[in-house]
Swiss-Prot record:
Tissue: Expressed ubiquitously.
Protein name (database record): Protein PARALOG OF AIPP2
Biological process terms in GO annotation: negative regulation of gene expression, epigenetic; negative regulation of transcription elongation by RNA polymerase II; regulation of photoperiodism, flowering
UniProt-listed SUPFAM superfamilies: FYVE/PHD zinc finger
InterPro entries per UniProt: AIPP2-like_SPOC (IPR056280), PHD1-3/5-6 (IPR049914), Znf_FYVE_PHD (IPR011011), Znf_PHD (IPR001965), Znf_PHD-finger (IPR019787), Znf_RING/FYVE/PHD (IPR013083)
Region listing for Disordered, in residue ranges: 1-21, 114-141, 178-280, 369-390, 411-440, 460-701, 975-1050, 1059-1078, 1087-1138, 1152-1186, 1249-1311
Gene that encodes it: PAIPP2
Binding-site residues, Zn(2+) 1: C286, C289, H310, C313
Bias type Polar residues, positions: 411-431, 487-502, 529-552, 569-607, 668-694, 977-988, 1014-1025, 1250-1263
Species in which this protein is naturally found: Arabidopsis thaliana
Description of its domains: The PHD domain (283-334) recognizes specifically unmodified histone H3 lysine 4 (H3K4me0), binding affinity being inversely proportional to H3K4 methylation level.
Length: 1311
């Protein structure tokens, strides 16, 4: 009945086969009676398999339909293919006759006879079938008919059929040898036959395993037979040839032509191996990447001919192909485990036989093994070796064919065990063969590229294990991508067993064709598990899937055998492997601990997880588990000895990363607050692991607490500055990295911390501080960034960092944590507070004297901002006035040198809503980016600088994919309020030049002496104040005192750059200096623009100059003409000061105020101003600064009279002469070198350089002329000022234009 059922199935699959009656070309006997079925069947290996799958029914159907269906063209084609064609036709004819004679007997006998005949015929007829798949089908059908006829004849005359079977073997082998090349070519071309898809698949399988095509055929026939005999019909689809072999075995069992079938199958396998061999030799594919890649870097395994790996794909990359013998990973492991493999194979056979006995009749089971053994024996003589055991691995048969001939018997036995195993578990076998068969068939369709396609499917088997499809119940029958799950070279049972790494990467259930492998692996795993786990049987407590974990302690093959279900067996296998790895699992939900595998077996465990239960989630695959299971595959088992330690480590690190990331995506931690990794629910954790975990936890707590205490203490110190915070926090983080790398993850901490423990960032020194919400010692263990949670009572209330990440409970210690990217927000990243700290309007005053109102702007405090930022921002008015200035003018020097960072951001400015963004915010940002502008405002002595985010590093230029505005605060550079800050500093002497020297440049030596004495008395304190002010712009006292000035004055003092030519006039300012109690009034007067300059009459009232202690107030009416900050003012003293002290002291103070300018040009101009100042004094006091016969220069200007004579005309012709002298004179540098000066040149010098000490009239004239000349000079210099304007602002708000050219002379003077 089983045969008939099989036959019917095969008929359903191959009802199209056609056969023509004829005589055997070898023995001239009817094909039905002759066993020589070399007719074109060799070309159709697929036909064999399909015929085998459809043996009984096909035979009957063929007898019915062969005459009608078989086109003559096919017969002709067979004939044209030499003996194979004629034999095929003869076989078809004879088989047709025999079938017509005994249709029913054919059905019964057909299974064995057809399988045998088809095997032989397929071997012989491969070339003809390669010509056309129709031919293959016809030949297959003919073979089936012949087989059926042979079976009938055998029934009539069993001896004759046996003899003919022997003859057929010899004839087929001869024909195959003769037509080997033709068969190969025909095999390549045999795909077009529509009905021969299975045939092609079979062929491809055989081709893939050329070394043992014979064995493959036998094993496949056996497997098919088992499948057919078993209720599952998938086996028939998978490998008809296997079914044929099994049927042949059954026939033998029944006493029917078993010998002939075995011989035929062996012959067919040989021919198939021949045909496939050619194709296989053409392609060498890397087992790892699945591509030919660089052939010069492709290392070929010397142990197994099919093993190949690129040097750059190897676990340990090599620079060049190794010389001499090189063993692939599988072969290397096989060498160590050959003995174990043999034992496993025997046990596997027993197990599978026992298991399959429940599903098949005992006699059939025995017959199948016998047939398999016979076929194996016949196939052992197969001359060809499988070059593509990987491809063969897709099919049970071929998976074992990659073994060396030395292991050929073992392989055959393995295949037999696999066949019995498949017969035992029809569903399981059908599925793996299905996946394999489908792949193999697809590859066979393109026989020229079987390996390449297979490799494509099996690309990176080790890497793809983590990406394999989620668990598919093999019983359900879902097709698995075997190529992905299985390593390309695990085709051999020995290879698969030997290479545990690849087998591990493969699910233990990857193939039931490879279940022998899995059993072997299980056995190895059991042994290793026994060694590593030290007889610790850990029960898996998966609440949802008891069946998955019910085989917790079943490490014996007996338990596996007793278990009648393959799923349970595979589960047991996975459990055993897991037990060996001692992976801890949190019980809960549907999560099975089986999914947890050591790093070395992550792949296999993943496959197991996928195959075992759909409900189980494989965290190794990057899929989040139900909160109970922490990173299952991410648990390093360093103590577990593995041959593949490095591989497992690499895979583990990858899996760890993926699992951590997956877990970080929202895996809720189901553990309770007090629950740790050692909870009773955790299974598979060894005592050593538990102790290690405890120790690590203790160390972690101690180290973190210590660090937290130290950091908190440091933070409390006032000197704990921003930079120190950075350095210390960085150092602590680094230290944390070392310690936390061996600390457990959040699963060791209460889940309460996981959920509630959010990293908070306080603003201390501009850097974030992580705060625990409750317990200061509860610290979030960040995998990559070891962030300390600083418990401190003095810190600012923390703000939540977005987003909040909850880690999955991880068991046990994650030693590779440093490799895992931290999903927590980095401490150094600046994030705007969710709540805005200020909301209002920005009034932007543009450079072109226009203003624009931008409403709906709100400021958000940065998480890295200093606490003082909040204080300042709280004082922001609702409408904040800002100046639009070029960015470069306000760009801090720190940014120029070091660049900008996220940590520099103090405020984020955003629009409050979409409408405000479109109307106001976006245009403002675009304009600033386009024109490289910045916004500058000041408040409370602090400048607010706002820039566009395009100036930030590229990784933080956008927020929500949009550019934004960010602000920083900068202390304003101000003069000391104790100084005469109300007066323009542009009118004073440079601070870095000694007033004595300045006097020397403009007065005789005696006057210098007098001036020196006055300076010593008056400027000691003043200079000291000035010097202090030069270095104390950041002094808070300075800021506070400067705040007393009017806001407009503040703006003038601010460090903003004014465009050249823009006149900045100080408003009326009243200031008081605590030091000298000098009170000055600067009255703003009408501006007079003369070529860009302004004349400001300034009235200065002073009482009690500080140094001299003089209480007489000074009232000075000063005419300051200026066009820019550089413009030299002309001072006019309205009241005669005290002869020596008042006037000179006043001059000194003014000069001292100019120090902050720090520019030579300014210095020179202030000297002019000071000279004019002194000239305004009366009597001897004013004469101090006048020109005398003795000059300051190294040269001696003796012609004072001449100079005076020349100066006198200035008073007569002020306009003409003055202009002529000023415009025509250039600085005569020869004067500094001691050369004679001409009248013109001397006059060109400032008037204070030429003064006669003898003539008071001349001094008065020179004073008047100097005033006029100064006015003229200012007018002329207004044009030159713009190019030399400095980008500095001073307490004096006036802008001075370029220096007079004659003043360059002073630069060369010695000092």
């Amino acid at each position: 009945m089983a045969d008939r059922r099989v036959g019917k199935r095969q008929m359903g699959q191959r009802g199209f086969s056609k056969v023509e009656s004829g005589t055997c070309n070898v023995c001239s006997a009817p094909c039905s009676s002759c066993m020589h079925r070399n007719v074109g069947f060799t070309g159709s290996k697929l036909d064999e398999s399909s015929d085998e799958n459809c043996h009984g029914v096909v035979g009957s159907q063929c007898s019915v339909n062969e005459d009608d269906l078989l086109p003559s063209s096919m017969v002709n084609a067979h004939k044209s293919l030499n003996n194979t064609a004629s034999e095929a036709s003869n076989l078809v004819n004879s088989s047709h006759d025999a079938l017509s004679e005994n249709a029913e007997s054919k059905e019964t006998i057909r299974c064995s006879g057809i399988s045998d005949d088809s095997g032989a015929a397929a071997m012989t007829s491969k070339p003809s079938l390669s010509g056309s798949r129709m031919k293959h089908k016809v030949s297959a059908s003919a073979n089936m008919l012949d087989q059926s006829s042979n079976c009938i004849e055998d029934q009539e005359d069993g001896i004759l059929s046996a003899d003919r079977a022997k003859q057929l073997k010899s004839g087929c082998s001869n024909n195959e040898i003769g037509n080997k090349d033709l068969a190969d070519g025909s095999a390549l071309n045999s795909d077009p036959i529509p009905g021969g898809s299975r045939k092609d698949e079979v062929k491809l399988e055989s081709l893939q395993n050329p070394s043992s095509n014979h064995d493959d055929r036998v094993s496949s026939e056996k497997g098919n037979f088992k499948e057919k005999s078993r209720p599952g019909g998938n086996k028939e689809r998978q490998e008809p040839s296997v079914e044929g072999s099994t049927r042949s075995g059954e026939n033998r069992k029944d006493g029917k032509s078993s010998k002939s079938s075995s011989s035929n199958s062996s012959a067919v396998s040989e021919s198939e191996s021949d045909d496939s061999e050619m194709v296989e030799h053409d392609v060498k594919v890397c087992d790892i990447c699945g591509d030919a890649g660089r052939e010069d870097l492709l290392a070929i395994c010397s142990g197994c001919s099919d093993g190949a790996e690129h040097t750059y794909c190897m676990r340990e990359m090599l620079d060049e192909v190794p010389e001499g013998d090189w063993l692939c990973e599988e072969c290397a492991e096989e060498a160590e485990k050959q003995k174990q493999e043999a034992k496993r194979k025997r046990e596997t056979e027993v197990t599978f036989n026992t298991y399959s006995s429940g599903k098949r009749h005992a006699d059939k089971i025995e017959a199948a093994p016998d047939a398999k053994r016979q076929v194996v024996e016949a196939s052992t003589g197969s001359p060809k070796k499988s070059i593509l055991p990987r491809v063969g691995a897709l099919s049970r048969e071929t998976s074992f064919k990659g073994l060396d001939r030395l292991r050929g018997k073992l392989n055959h036995q393995t295949s037999f065990s696999d066949d019995t195993e498949s017969a035992r578990s029809a569903g399981s076998q059908l599925q793996p063969p299905k996946g394999a068969f489908l792949k193999s068939s697809s590859f066979n369709c393109s026989s020229s590229k079987p390996k390449v396609q297979l490799m494509d499917d099996a690309i990176h088997p080790r890497q793809k294990t983590g990406k394999e499809d989620t668990a598919l119940d093999l019983k359900v029958g879902g097709f698995r991508n075997v190529g992905k799950s299985m390593p390309s070279r695990t085709t051999d049972a020995g290879n698969s067993g030997g290479s545990d790494s690849q087998a591990k990467m493969l699910g233990s259930k990857v193939y039931h064709s490879q279940e022998g492998k899995s059993l072997k692996q299980v056995k190895d795993r059991n042994r290793e598990a026994n060694a590593s786990a030290s007889s610790i049987d850990q029960k898996l407590k998966s609440r949802g899937n008891s069946s998955v974990s019910h085989a917790n302690n079943n490490r014996d093959l007996k338990g596996l055998q007793s278990d009648g279900k393959r799923g349970n067996l595979t589960k047991q296998v996975s459990n055993l492997s897991r037990n060996r790895l001692e992976n801890s699992v949190v019980s809960g939900g549907d999560i099975s601990t089986n999914e947890k595998c050591s790093a070395s077996e992550q792949s296999s465990s993943q496959a197991d997880c996928k195959d075992e239960l759909p409900s189980t989630s494989c965290t190794g695959e990057g899929m989040p588990n139900h909160g109970t299971v922490a990173l299952q595959d991410g648990l390093p088992r360093s103590r577990v000895p593995r041959e593949v330690g490095k591989k497992s480590k690499e895979a583990f690190s990858k899996r760890q990363r993926s699992s951590l990331l997956a877990g970080a995506k929202g895996l809720p931690s189901s553990q309770k607050g007090g629950q740790t990794a050692e909870s009773s629910d955790t299974s598979g954790v060894s005592d050593s692991d538990l102790s290690t975990t405890k120790n690590v936890k203790e160390d972690l707590n101690k180290g973190n607490r210590l660090r937290a205490a130290v950091d908190a203490a440091l933070r409390k110190k006032p000197s704990f500055g921003k930079n120190r915070v950075l350095e210390q926090s960085d150092a602590s983080l680094v230290a944390n990295v070392d310690s936390s790398s061996e600390k457990t993850l959040r699963n060791q901490l209460p889940s309460k911390m996981h959920k509630n423990h959010v990293s908070h960032e306080g603003l201390q020194g501009g850097h974030p501080i992580l705060w625990p919400t409750s317990d200061p010692y509860k610290q979030t263990i960040v995998t990559n960034e070891k962030q300390l949670i600083f418990p401190g009572a003095d810190t600012i209330p923390s703000r939540l960092v977005e987003p909040e990440v909850s880690f999955p409970a991880v068991k046990p210690v994650m030693r590779d944590l440093p490799l895992v990217p931290s999903p927590v927000m980095l401490r150094s990243s600046a994030i705007p507070d969710h709540e805005f700290i200020w909301q209002g309007d920005l009034e932007v005053r543009k450079i072109i004297n226009q203003s624009a109102m931008h409403s709906g702007i709100q400021a958000h405090l940065s998480t890295l901002a200093s606490p003082r930022v909040a204080e300042v921002v709280n004082k922001f008015p609702e409408t904040f006035s800002l100046n639009e200035v070029p960015r470069k003018s306000t760009w801090p020097t720190q940014f120029e040198k070091l660049g900008t960072k996220e940590a520099h951001i103090a405020l984020f400015f955003f629009a409050k809503d979409t409408e405000s963004y479109e109307r106001n915010y976006k245009p403002l940002v675009d304009n600033m980016i386009k024109n490289d502008l910045a916004l500058k405002g000041n408040l409370d002595n602090v400048d607010l600088l706002i820039f566009a985010s395009n100036q930030l590093p590229s990784n933080c230029q956008r927020w929500n994919m949009l550019y934004f505005l960010w602000g920083v605060f900068q202390g304003r550079k101000e003069t000391n309020p104790q100084k005469n800050t109300s007066l323009p500093t542009s009118n004073v002497l440079p601070r870095d030049r000694d007033p004595k020297e300045l006097c020397q440049t403009s007065s005789p030596s005696k006057h210098l002496e007098k001036g020196s004495s006055l300076r010593e008395s008056s400027s000691n304190g003043i200079e000291t104040r000035n010097g202090t002010d030069a270095r104390s712009h950041e002094n808070p006292n300075n800021r506070e005192s400067s705040i007393e000035r009017s806001p407009s004055k503040k703006e003038d003092i601010a460090l903003k750059v004014e465009e050249a030519g823009v006149n900045h006039i100080p408003p009326q300012v009243t200031g008081s200096n605590s030091g000298d109690s000098l009170v000055r009034k600067v009255q703003k007067v009408e501006e007079q623009e003369l070529g860009g300059r302004k004349d400001l009459p300034l009235t200065v009232m002073g009482s009690g100059i500080q140094s001299h202690g003089q209480d007489n107030p000074l009232e000075k009416d000063l005419n300051s003409s200026q066009a820019s900050h550089r413009k030299r003012p002309l001072w006019e003293l309205s009241n005669p000061a005290n002869e020596n002290s008042s006037a000179i002291n006043q001059k000194v103070e003014l000069n001292n105020d100019g120090l902050c300018e720090g520019s030579p040009n300014k210095k020179l101009k202030t000297e002019n101003g000071s000279s004019s100042l002194c000239r305004d004094t009366s009597g001897h006091d004013s004469g101090i600064m006048k020109k005398s016969p003795k000059v300051v220069f190294p040269l001696d200007l003796n012609d004072d009279s001449e100079m005076v004579d020349n100066l006198s005309p200035l008073g007569n012709d002020e306009n003409n002469n003055n202009r002529r002298l000023i415009s025509g004179t250039v600085p005569n540098l020869e004067l500094a070198l001691g050369a004679e000066e001409t009248t013109e040149a001397t006059m060109g010098l400032l008037p204070f350089l030429s003064r006669s000490s003898n003539s008071g009239e001349q001094s008065n004239n020179s004073m008047n002329k100097e005033k006029q000349k100064a006015d003229e000079e200012e007018e002329d210099d207004a044009e030159v000022a713009a190019s030399l304007s400095l980008s500095l602002s001073f307490p004096g708000t006036e802008e001075r234009k370029n220096v007079n050219t004659p003043l360059f002379l002073f630069r060369d003077l010695p000092r």
